[in-house]
Amino acid sequence: MSRGLGDVYKRQTVEENLAIGAYSSKDKEKLKKNIEMVYDIFPRLGERREQLARTMSGGEQQMLAIGRALTLSPRLLLIDEVSMGLMPIMVNTCFKVIHDLNKNGITVLVVEQNANKALKVANRGYVLETGKIVLSDTAENLRGNNVVQNAYLGA
C-alpha cells in the first residue's frame, strides 16, 4: 500500500489501528460507535479484531485504511487508487463501500485508473492527461462519451 490511502500500522491489530485513527477524538463513546460502524461496513475486519495488520491481504489492509479514516466521521474522504493490486472481489467490495458512503452523505473524492469502476460509483468525473483536466462531466455523460469509451473503457 505504498500509494493507496495510507499505510496501516503493520505491528498493530485491527482494533488498535482503528483506535489510532481516531486518536484525537475525545468522545470515547462516539469512537466505540464509529469502530462498530466500521465493523458493520467491513464484517471481515470485525472477525479479525485481534489480527496484526501485517498478516492481512492487501484488500483487507485497504479496508482497514478506509475504516481508520471513517472513525473520525469525516464529511470528505480522499481515496487514491483504491483498486491497485487488489483481487477483483476486493475491488468490487471497495467500490460498493465508496458508493454506500456517498449515499450516506460522505463526499468521496476518488483518484482511480480503473475508469469503468470509478464512473459507475461517481456523480461526476474528470479525465486528466499530463496533469491537466481534458474532460469534465457527469459520470453518466463520460461513460457515453466516445473518446472516453475508446481510450479508457475498452470499447
State each model region's role.
Residues 91-104:
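Helical segment within the ABC ATPase nucleotide-binding domain
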